[in-house]
């Protein structure tokens, strides 16, 4: 089964505010872009992935991620400023299904800089057995991937505590080991240290090398 992934990227100037203890205001936009670039590059290298649709209103992110082979689309112009992440994912999934009605679709976080193509393929392979499925994040409270098989809506419920919401929505939680790179999103300095320990992509490695991160 070949999946199309929807990856939401918020405006870089507002991204990763919780990394303020690790990265200065002037540095965080570049770090967020590096996370997204390494995430998208790894996703496109996964054998289970047909393509990646990036939903963003940030022109730099759109340009850089398109250069990697993703398709960048703006957020839904009919959506209000408070509609946020889940509206962007619904919009991206709808665009995918407009072109390929029977395509399996998965939402993937943009902040998985240690992502391994083989681990992502394994997660998507497991998800293919269910109408909807999700993978919890490393912290055990959120979600890094939500998948919907052909004929089923994505119905995203991302945000704090999304693991519980996705489970209550009927999505099956994937109980997989050895897929740490798909679970390790980066919101805090501790998350970044954990991702660096797994081994991040080249753009994140270069950006992180300019930071003083204790323990690295």
Swiss-Prot record:
Entry keywords, A to Z = GTP-binding, Nucleotide-binding, Nucleotidyltransferase, Transferase
Q: Which GO terms describe its biological process?
A: F420-0 metabolic process
Q: Which domain of life is it from?
A: Bacteria
Pathway involvement of the protein, from the record: Cofactor biosynthesis; coenzyme F420 biosynthesis
Mention one GO molecular function.
GTP binding
Q: Can you tell me which residues bind phosphoenolpyruvate?
A: 143, 159, 162
Q: Name one Pfam family in it.
A: NTP_transf_3
Q: Which residues form a coiled coil?
A: none
The signal peptide stretch is none
Acyltransferase: is it a keyword of this entry? no
Would the keyword Kinase be found if you checked this record's keyword annotation? no
InterPro entries in alphabetical order: CofC, MobA-like_NTP_Trfase, Nucleotide-diphossugar_trans
UniProt catalytic activity:
phosphoenolpyruvate + GTP + H(+) = enolpyruvoyl-2-diphospho-5'-guanosine + diphosphate
Q: For this protein, what is the EC number?
A: 2.7.7.105
> Which PANTHER family does this UniProt record tie to the protein?
2-PHOSPHO-L-LACTATE GUANYLYLTRANSFERASE (PTHR40392:SF1)
The record ties this protein, via HAMAP family, to: CofC (MF_02114)
**Function statement:** Guanylyltransferase that catalyzes the activation of phosphoenolpyruvate (PEP) as enolpyruvoyl-2-diphospho-5'-guanosine, via the condensation of PEP with GTP. It is involved in the biosynthesis of coenzyme F420, a hydride carrier cofactor.
The record's comment on protein family reads: Belongs to the CofC family.
| Name of this protein | Phosphoenolpyruvate guanylyltransferase
Species of the source:
Streptomyces scabiei (strain 87.22)
- Gene expressing this chain: fbiD
């Amino acid at each position: 089964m070949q999946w199309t992934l929807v990856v939401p990227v918020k405006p870089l100037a507002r991204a990763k505010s919780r990394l303020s203890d690790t990265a200065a205001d002037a540095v965080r936009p570049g770090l967020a872009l590096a996370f997204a670039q390494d995430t998208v590059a790894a996703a496109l290298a996964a054998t289970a992935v047909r393509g990646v649709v990036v939903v963003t209103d940030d022109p730099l992110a759109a340009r850089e991620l398109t250069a990697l082979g993703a398709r960048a689309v703006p957020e839904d112009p009919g959506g209000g400023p408070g509609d946020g992440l889940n509206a962007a994912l619904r919009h991206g999934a709808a665009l995918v299904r407009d072109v390929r009605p029977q395509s399996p679709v998965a939402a993937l976080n943009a902040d998985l800089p240690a992502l391994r193509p083989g681990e992502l393929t394994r997660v998507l392979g497991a998800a293919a057995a269910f109408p909807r499925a999700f993978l919890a994040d490393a912290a055990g409270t959120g979600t890094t991937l939500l998948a919907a098989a052909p004929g089923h809506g994505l119905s995203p419920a991302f945000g704090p505590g999304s693991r519980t919401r996705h489970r209550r929505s009927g999505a099956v939680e994937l109980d997989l080991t050895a897929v740490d790179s798909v679970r390790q999103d980066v919101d805090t300095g501790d998350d970044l240290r954990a991702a660096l320990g797994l081994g991040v992509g080249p753009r994140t490695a270069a950006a992180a090398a300019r930071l003083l991160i204790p323990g690295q």
